[in-house]
Structure formats: structure tokens, C-alpha cells
Amino acid sequence: MRYDPSLIEKKWQQFWKEHKSFKADETADKPKYYVLDMFPYPSGAGLHVGHLIGYTATDIVARYKRAKGFSVLHPMGWDSFGLPAEQYAVRTGTHPRETTKKNIENFRKQLSAMGFSYDEAREFATSDPEYYRWTQKLFLFLYEKGLAYMADMAVNYCEELGTVLANEEVENGLSIEGGYPVERRMLRQWILRITAYADQLLQGLEDLDWPENVKQLQRNWIGKSEGALLRFVVDKDKCLEVFTTRPDTLCGVSFLVMAPEHPEIQQLVSEEQRSAVESYIRCAQSKSERERISETKVKSGVFTGAYAKHAITGAALPIWVSDYVIMGYGSGVVMGVPAHDERDREFANAFALPIDEVLDENEHCINSNHGDFLLNGLQGKEASDYVIAYLQKRNLGEAKVMYKLHDWLFSRQRYWGEPIPIIHFEDGTCRPLEDDELPLLPPEIQDYRPKGFGQGPLAKVKEWVDIHDVKTQRPGRRETHTMPQWAGSCWYYLRFCDAHNSQAPWSHENERYWMPVDLYIGGAEHAVLHLLYSRFWHRVFYEAGLVSTPEPFKKLINQGLVLATSYRIPGKGYVHPEDAREDNGKWTTASGEELEVRQEKMSKSKLNGVDPQILIDEFGADALRMYAMFSGPLDKNKLWCNQGVSGCRRFLNRFYELATSSAVQDIDDPKGMALAHRLVHKVGEDIEKMSLNTIPSSFMEFINEFAKLDTYSKSALSMVVRALAPIAPHISEELWTVLGYAPGIDNAGWPEVDPKYLEDTSVTFVIQVNGKLRARLDMDKNTSQEDILSAARESVAKYLEDKEIKKEVFVPNRLVNFVL
């Protein structure tokens, strides 16, 4: 029979849909398994094959676990709020809702063509009002807990995007979205108090089965530092607080430096220096954080005209303002120890400030005894503990743990996001909306551009913003900021547990059944964004008794990048691969322009993405699924090669022909069964270990050996087909029915492996003629002596031709010698 995936795959996809084959049930008598992909943002570009690596891996695990008797939750949804749809709306006037709907339809079609076994009934988008009603409700829960608040703060403002960005959305002074310049400005914002959970988030990492590099990224981002909070007296009513991890260097302090955003600068600055300080602050506000902290930047600063008293020496320490100090970590003030800190030394050299050595080459304290303060000779922690104890007695300092982590800047000046469900009143108070007022929908608008700095598009809709509040009978003003894209993805995994609940975001019963997520697969780029934010929300819910587990994701795997060849005209941009020409090892365009050829991450911008539908049309989804795994270990970068899909298609052709041939018989064949049992055992082990890249080659090795048999055991093939089903489900379903079984191969269960077949029963015989080695012969050790001698004669037939065998020497499991 001929293998035609175009017919087979559509047939079985329709069967699964009609029979709701992948519907997840909360079945008490079954163990559960929750396997989840980081759900995608439905962009206009659609999916390329690089996106399918992780999705294929989770689908293999989901199908395997169903076959093993688990109740499996394997859902898919859409992280559909976000900036690209809004930017498209600004350019075209098309409502983001319409763009998003169209993109989701395309994504759904692409995923369906791959045969992924999602529970379609649980699908939702974060932009569905039925979903973000609960996102708004959960935000209000955080507000009631004191974890959501408003404050004036220095923010990352991107003029090109027209919105404020969280620290996690800025890299090297540029927006991660689009790579636009970001500057610091003061703005009143909604903020989530993630720092209140810094220690819990840090400790919780220890028990997670996550890649160590992701855990380390979160540790570094949280940035726990143990040190001291020191107070430097400015006058009798005012102190400046400084956090330091090196209190042992206190006697080397010769100046203090404040961040330009520090709120107390205006109270400290002298009238003579006020104009210069204010000018410097304005200049600093126009710089990105990357510019300010650059190691190659010449240090700048301005003297405030004020001094602080050194806690030990009593010296007057000049107080400066410099943009190399960033507000938000520590207290926004640093103590200048130029002899032992490179940045401080550069600053001291720039402004001719004293440099006092207080540590020797072995880090022992020197030049640090003053009166009853005796620090000389002490080292490291002992020295720091002495300083802290001395200052604490005088109310000038204490031990302090600080975190690099900032509270999460939560509001955005955008349209396409969840409206924040708060009403503000003229007296400065505000009211959270009640349950019967949710969801709060955004108004329909024509102009999606921000109104100006600090005001999103919603601020322009006066009839929506300015209201008469029916609950209080007072005039009020709706909040015009929206939530960030991360809000909906902070808790979506919980909604999948109970996607149709209209009374609550999830029920306790369903949450207790499904949580935590057993396997979570997605990109490492979310290490300090989505993964940290969702852990924070989950910790809050856990403390409140809303969820049963302290952590949401038990095991995490980051799939590696998929690389593909890109072609670029230097200084101009990328060209499509079909426009590239090779001539004597050089690549050019059709017009002769020289090209740079690289192996880069597959992406739309580099024009090197591969549309999976093209490969499905040519080779079939099962072949594409097999190659997606065969291309390399799941967590490693891999180079995509379309020819590899062709090789997997050839294997499937061969397997289909073998399984549908007349040689398939209902017989008991020990050799065929042994091959099948060993394959099933190997495939099961590889799935459990997530060594999915070795599975295709195991099947190829199997068929090479199995095809040598004269007849093919139906029982052996039924095992192999069931083992193939997780990775190539369409052909497996088809062959399962061809072999005479009822449709629905997942329901047939995973084949039971008999340990007796796993023993190595092969024996290598040395075949000699007159004592000379002429051949080697692999035989099953249970083969009869007569059959072994027959096979041995055949293996050395050319040496026996026209000769009389005088004697046959047979040594069991070792040797056959023909004496002529």
C-alpha cells in the first residue's frame, strides 16, 4: 500500500476533533499529568518551524502519558494582549481585536496541521473579556493585600513606543521590543510590591527541577546582598542612609554621591550650587541607564554645597550628585571609597578628591583606628561585624539585607491591555471596582496613539474617563493606564485547570487536582520576566490559600534556538534565500551584490524562517515532527535542514510499506518480538529522560533489522506502532486500524515490555575452515545446533565448494570448524 500523508493526516485530525480525543478529565482514579507550553503571542508572521520544536516535544510527552494511563492536561491558548497589534492599529486604523482574531485563526490552523493533541475546549485568549475579567479581579486582590500601589518614580520611558517599560523590558538602554532608546523620567505609576517576596522567590528556586542557568539568572536578578545600612549625619535633623556590602572600608570614605533622582537633593543643596545641580539633573534625565553606568564613560558630577559628618573620624564629607549612581538599588546614595573601588577612584580623580588606603594586599584593615574604634588588623566578615556593632550602639547603622530586585512597574500607556479597574476621586482617594462591575472594557476608539508623556490612548476618551460613580454618587475619573502584557500570562496556567468557570478564576477542586504544572517548556528569554512574575503571583495566592502549591512549574525545559542560513547585504539588510546565488564559493544576489552568509536564529526579520505548511505539504506532518526531534537535543541550539525532513519521510514510507505488506502474519516470532520489546523499552526510557532526539534513529535501526525477517509478527508490529504514536501519530493511527484494531491508538495503552526480551540472547560464532577464520556469525543462543551448522555452512560456502567435509567441530556459543 502507498503512504499518502495528505489523506491520512486530515482523516485522523478530523477523527480526533469529532471524538474529542484529547479532552482532559479530573479523574480521581487516574494519576494526573499537566504538560504546558509557554503560550504564544499570535503575531501576524505566524509560526515558523523553530516554534514547533517545543510544541512537538510537549505533544510527545502528552501522548505518551495518556498511553501510560495518566489523565493528561495539555492545553493551548493565546497571550494576545501586546504592543505589536497596537502598533499595527496606529499604522492602519485596524482595531487590535480584529488583527488578533485573524492571527489566532492562522496560528490555530498551523498547530492543527501538526496534529498536536490539545484539549481545544480549554482554549482562551488573554484579550477575551471573559478571561481578563479575572485578571482584573486578581489585580484587585493584590491591591487589597497592599501589594499594588501608586507612586511617583523614575521610570524607563520610550518615546518611540509612547509608554513606560519595566526594568526587565529594557536591555542596555534600549527597549527589548523594537530596540528603541529609553530615558529616565519621573511619573506616577502603578507598582506591584514584588520585593516583599524577594526572599521567598530566592529560596523557592532550590527545590525546582529547572535549568541551573535559569535559576542563576533569577538569583542574580533578585540580587540578594548582605551588608550594612549606615547613617551619615548632615545636620541635627537629617541623615543620609547608605547601603554598603563593605562596611570594613568605612574609614576610607572621603565623599558621598547621590543619584540625580534622589528625593532629598533639593533639601540639601546650597543656594550657591542650586542652579548647577538642577542643570545637571536635567541633563542626567536625558540619558539612558546604559549611558550612565557605562564603564568607558568619563565620570561626571556636581557638588551640592553640603557636607555630611563621617561617623568615625568626624571629617566633613562633601556630598556630590553623579549619574553613575542609580536610584532604586540600595538607598540611592553611595559612600565614595576611591582607594578600593574603581568607579569611586575614577570619580575622585576627576574632581581631585582624597584617596585613603584602608586595606592592605591581604584585605586586612589598616589606617582605621580612631579613639575607641579599633579596626586595624581585622579582616573580612570579622571587620564588618565590628563596624556594624560599633555603629549600632550609636544608632548610626545596622546590619541590612538588600535586593537588587525593584518593585514591578505595572502600568502602561497603551490601549491594547487590561484596563486597570480603579476609579480616582478629586480628594485623592480611589475605589476598586466591585465584582458586578467587571470586566471593565476599554472604549472603542479611532486613534490608538498615546496622548502624550504619561498618558495613554484611553486618556483621550473623555466620556469614558470622566464618570459619575453610581456606587458612591461622586464624580470620578477612571484609571487610564493599562496592565502590561505580562499580567495575563502571570496566571493563565491556573485558568487552564478550570477554563469555563464563570464564578471564579478557578475552583479549588480543579486546582488541587492539576497543579503544579509537571512539565513546562518555553524559551530561556523569559527567565526574569514571565517566569519570575508568575512565581510572584503564585506565591501570593499560596499564602492566601487560593492555590495548593508554593510553586507553579515543577519541571522547566528551555528549548534551544533553531538556526537557519541567512543572507545579508552588508550595510543594507537581509534578502530572501531564493534571491541568493552561489558561484565558486561566493554568495551574491541576482544583481551581483556580495552577501554575508550566516547561521542565525530563525526569525521573520532575518528572512530565514521556514513555513511549516510548506514542509507539511511536501513531506507530511509526521515527517516534520520526527525531524523536529531528530535535529538535535531539545535544550541545545540546532541548525535546521529541510533535507532532514525528507529522510524522515523515507523512513515512514518504508515502515508503512512493511506494516501493510503480505508478510505481516499472526505468528509467534521470538526474534521479531525481541526487537519490538527492546525498541519499546528504549523509546519509553528516552521519553522519560526527554532524550527525544534519539528516538527517530532507534526506529530506523529497528526497521533495518526487522525488515531482514522473512515474516513480520503482527503482535510485534502492534507494539511498535503504539510506540511510534507519540512522535508520528497520524501514520500510527492509520496502521493501527490496518492491523485490525479499533481506532483511537491512545486508548490502547503503552505496550508492556517483557524483561526476558531485554536480555542479550545473541552469540557470535567464529566460523573456521581447516582452523582458519573465514567468517563470523551472529545467532540467537537458543538456536538449535542443526540450524547453526546450516547457517555456518552457508556463510563459508565458497570455501566448501566442491570439497568434502570430513568433520564438523561444534563448540556451543563459540565456534564452528569445518575440517576438509
UniProtKB/Swiss-Prot annotation:
Gene Ontology molecular-function annotations: aminoacyl-tRNA deacylase activity; ATP binding; leucine-tRNA ligase activity
Catalytic activity: tRNA(Leu) + L-leucine + ATP = L-leucyl-tRNA(Leu) + AMP + diphosphate
Positions that bind ATP: 604
Localization in the cell: Cytoplasm
GO biological process, alphabetically ordered: leucyl-tRNA aminoacylation
PROSITE patterns, sorted: AA_TRNA_LIGASE_I
Keyword Cytoplasm: yes
Keyword ATP-binding: yes
Span of the annotated motif 'KMSKS' region: 601-605
EC number: 6.1.1.4
Gene3D superfamilies found in the cross-reference section: HUPs, Isoleucyl-tRNA Synthetase, Domain 1
Motif annotated as 'HIGH' region, chain positions: 40-51
Entry GO terms, CC: cytosol
InterPro entries found in the cross-reference section: aa-tRNA-synth_I_CS, aa-tRNA-synth_Ia, Leu-tRNA-ligase, Leu_tRNA-synth_edit, M/V/L/I-tRNA-synth_anticd-bd, Methionyl/Leucyl_tRNA_Synth, Rossmann-like_a/b/a_fold, tRNAsynth_Ia_anticodon-bd
Keywords: Aminoacyl-tRNA synthetase, ATP-binding, Cytoplasm, Ligase, Nucleotide-binding, Protein biosynthesis
Family named by the database record: Belongs to the class-I aminoacyl-tRNA synthetase family.
Protein's recorded name: Leucine--tRNA ligase
Gene source species: Chlamydia abortus (strain DSM 27085 / S26/3)
